[in-house]
């Protein structure tokens, strides 16, 4: 049962070689028990990181094309290729003053039919960022964050599920509202910072900026997917080992230099 009505948007990005799995991901979203008002898909012509780009803005997978043409709620937007940051920032900027919900998803997951319904309901219960995949980092202070030192989501107590420092990961879907970033004004869009400190780790950037805004994160234990279609994504290529830890520490250091408080 949906608690409230309102504009709910799904936002995602993808790369050229993922067209087949993207089609399966989108299919799982258009079949949700709670349909979003719109699905925004951000693609790019220019190559960047793992993406060779969509030359001449052409989608070459016929099944993906048919799905898009058959579902008017899917909107393709061609943008500069900033890698994973396309997933949230373009839509966040467009909807900055709107009282809406933005749910980001990955392009390589067949999602549970109730994902959006559950995320929206949990938002109205907790009024914060919501995700169904993540962890509680174990540290005495944020500067000592270690991506590998954590309490996994399935082991969290009810009290631990809601915390300022919980770390959501994109595959589980992440629910945001533009107002969650308003306290620090346009900080979240400062590409001269995030492209230098965490260019491949968008989760790190949104995590640190959210903390600066003093917005909690609720990590629910509801099912979020039916099948993982991922293979060789950013984490496998760039963010395994201690890359995420290094990126977060660099980001915190830079923001502290700019007098942001944690």
What is each model feature region?
Residues 6-9, 30-41, 71-74, 99-100:
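Short loop->beta transition adjacent to catalytic acidic/histidine clusters or analogous donor-positioning motifs
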Residues 91, 110-191:
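Conserved catalytic core of nucleotide-sugar-dependent glycosyltransferases
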Residues 25-37, 45-51:
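Short, acidic, metal-binding catalytic loop of nucleotide-sugar glycosyltransferases
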């Amino acid at each position: 049962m949906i608690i409230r009505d309102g504009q709910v948007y799904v936002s995602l990005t993808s790369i050229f070689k993922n067209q087949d799995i993207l089609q399966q991901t989108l299919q799982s979203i258009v079949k949700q028990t709670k349909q979003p008002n719109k699905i925004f898909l951000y693609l790019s012509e220019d190559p960047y990181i793992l993406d060779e780009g969509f030359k001449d803005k052409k989608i070459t997978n016929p099944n993906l094309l048919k799905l898009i043409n058959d579902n008017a709620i899917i909107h393709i937007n061609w943008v500069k290729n900033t890698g994973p940051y396309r997933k949230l920032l373009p839509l966040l900027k467009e909807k900055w003053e709107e009282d809406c919900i933005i749910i980001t998803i990955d392009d390589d997951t067949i999602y549970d039919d109730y994902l959006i319904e559950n995320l929206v309901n949990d938002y109205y219960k907790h009024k914060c960022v919501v995700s169904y995949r993540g962890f509680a980092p174990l540290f005495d202070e944020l500067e000592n964050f270690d991506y590998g030192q954590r309490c996994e989501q399935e082991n969290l107590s009810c009290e631990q599920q809601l915390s300022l420092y919980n770390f959501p990961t994109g595959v589980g879907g992440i629910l945001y509202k533009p107002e969650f970033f308003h306290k620090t004004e346009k900080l979240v869009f400062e590409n001269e910072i995030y492209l230098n400190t965490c260019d491949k780790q968008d989760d790190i950037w949104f995590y640190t900026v959210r903390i600066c805004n003093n917005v909690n994160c609720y990590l629910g234990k509801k099912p979020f997917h039916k099948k993982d279609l991922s293979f060789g994504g950013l984490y496998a290529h760039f963010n395994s080992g201690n890359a995420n830890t290094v990126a977060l520490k660099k980001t915190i250091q830079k923001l502290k230099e700019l007098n942001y408080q944690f």
